């Protein structure tokens, strides 16, 4: 959530910056609510002061032997007016809060201008794209020909955008998750964290998925207000909700391997083939909670940590800076990491690394105690995939495929595969 003071003091400037994110702020609606809020707040304070003053006079009248009843009646009437004003003020504040909850984060000054992903700016590339002496297959043809990737069974169990993995491929998927966690915890200093896969609505509000993106979520019917998590960003970041962290606890770096559940409501017709866009997938998430002055460096570090996984797997990739029009709701700045997929002959997103500044922290009231002031201040939060496991599996299948349809196991994964070096058809 944006700082309400910033909106009050620089409304036109904020509106102009939000336009670069393809968001039109309703300036008139905010201004009208804010004027009403100020007017009713002044009225409330005046009534409170008047009631307090007259209440004191009641005691004086009693001491002087005067009849206080007329003044008591007047105080009671003022009290009724005060309660009405307080209720009106709360109603206005609720409307302002609802409006604020729907306003996205402001883009950093360093974010490239642009309207869509076509305007994103490449920052760097790593690795050499492999030259095949045969026509490379996509992951669907490879997995199905090996008898290890089964979309028909996934559809039988749950419908479209689900898959069943078998034998060596299921093990390779598990190996990737373990490998990522091992690197992030032993080399990069993250705390491994296990959280619930179900959360209440307030957790999703804290990280910005609610109220704007409810259609993208799976809600569990019943007496509990539960949603399936769309990313581990939600439960892990919310661990600092309504907390005041000590300065020595920062930076706080956490990693978590979870399933993720998304309805893909806005993705009809996109990536319908294969595992690129699934309703259920797994991901290793990276979370940083930092002091404000640490967040610029933290974004570079987090992105580098995600890149390290691809480097160790020897998968070519590039990093792009998202333009304003392609930024997510809560992000102030984002780097996407895109891995090379030979069958598509292009780079595809495998990680999105974002600095949310104090946007999520304000929604969650996540703070740290600044030793210089001794006062609680909002932290900055960052998140990124380190990596999406299904998409990493796709990249391994396509980049390590052989002419006979077999798949070489990357060297770094062999210890997790029980010495299996090549994945072949069982037939």
From Swiss-Prot:
Main location: cytoplasm
Known EC number: 6.1.1.11
Annotated InterPro entries: aa-tRNA-synt_IIb, aa-tRNA-synth_II, aa-tRNA-synth_II/BPL/LPL, Ser-tRNA-ligase_type_1, Ser-tRNA-synth_1_N, SerRS_1_N_sf, SerRS_core, tRNA-bd_arm
Pathway: Aminoacyl-tRNA biosynthesis; selenocysteinyl-tRNA(Sec) biosynthesis; L-seryl-tRNA(Sec) from L-serine and tRNA(Sec): step 1/1
One Pfam entry name: tRNA-synt_2b
Family indicated by similarity: Belongs to the class-II aminoacyl-tRNA synthetase family. Type-1 seryl-tRNA synthetase subfamily.
Subunit structure: Homodimer. The tRNA molecule binds across the dimer.
Full protein name: Serine--tRNA ligase
The organism of origin for this protein: Hahella chejuensis (strain KCTC 2396)
Gene coding for it: serS
